[in-house]
Every structure is written in C-alpha cells, then in structure tokens.
Amino acid sequence: MNNVTKVMSVSIITNTFLSLIKIIIGFICKSSALLADGVHSFSDLLTDFFAIIGNIMAKKPADEKHPYGHGKIEYLTSIGISMVIIILGLTIINNSMHSKVVMSSLIVSIVSLITITLKYLLSEYIIRKGKKLENNILIASGKESRADVISSLVVFISAILSVFSKYIEVFKYSDKIAGIIVGILIIRTGFLILKENISIILGEQEIKGETLNKIRKIILNN
C-alpha cells in the first residue's frame, strides 16, 4: 500500500462513518440540512474512491500508446470528481427547496459539532499530505473535505437558530435555508476543482517552486 492509498484509506473510513451518522440522524430528525451534509460527506467518499483509482492508473508505466506515461489521468480523475460534486450540490438544493419546514433537535447540533471537529482534522491531514507528495488528487480531496467543514458549521448554526424559532418565526426556515447553502458550497467546491484541473491540462497552471527546482536539477545534471 503506497502513501496516497494510506491517506485515502483513512479518509474513506472517516467519511463512511460521518456520512452514515449524518444521513441516519438527518432522516430520523427530518433535517434537510443534516441530510444534505450527510450527502456532502458521501461525495467525499466518492472522491476518495476516485482518488485511489486515479492514483493507481496514473502510476502505470509509459507504453506505446502513452509514451509520456499516464500522469494526465490524475487530473482527468479530479475533473470527474468535480462533476460528481456539482451534480450532488444541485440535487441537494432542489431537495432542500421542496422540503417541509421542521425544527432541528439538540442531537442535530451535537452531530454537527462532532463532524466539524473530525472533518477539520481530516481535511488538514489530507491537504498536508497532498502537498508533500505533490499529488493533485489528494489536494482536491482535501479541499472537498474542507468545504464539508463549512457546511457542517452552517448546519450547526441553523440547528441553534431553530431552537429560537418559538420566539422569532423566521428562524423556523433555518434548516431549509441551511440545506440550500450547503448545496451552494458543494457546487462552489466542484467548480474550483474543475477550474484548477482544466487549467493544469491546458498548461495554464503555474509550476510550483519545489517542482521547478527539481526540473532545474534534472536539466543541470544532464
């Protein structure tokens, strides 16, 4: 098992746990926001699987049909990830707009708070490893996880506001609005990943300093 696979394995285990917890609790409590957040975690899970598959394919040696290797697969995989994320975001917005108005419970707040903590630690871990290994798929996965932290924070705030809906009527829509906001955040993440990887494929992305130094060393040594 290589370094990338190890990192993604940790992410898969964490996202599977969080996704199941949020979807189950969201369904029981009829919370559109928590369900949306659960689907967001599920999209992280899809990202992880894509990352592992893309990394394996990118490591294949060069052949007659691919004399420069299969490195581009890494970026194409990231583009595939971004498309899945965008579709999930649109689906969440649609479902939230047509959901019933409900009051969030204390358990929704607790689950969201736990998620915020775990996802923040996970996202920082993945991004740090991705930069160290110079692996674009890991970085894309880490950014998606970071967006999940923000969406969980939105759910947490909406759950708190919902408690005060008895006194301020407009707060009863907080769960519904939070679901829509989470959907927008997911779509934004998808577009950012899509833009970055298309730029790399088209040669528009600036080469990072560390990579540039390696290229210079290779040229000087030859």
Where are these regions (language model features)?
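Alpha-helical transmembrane cores and adjacent cytosolic helix/loop segments
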Residues: 1-209, 213-217
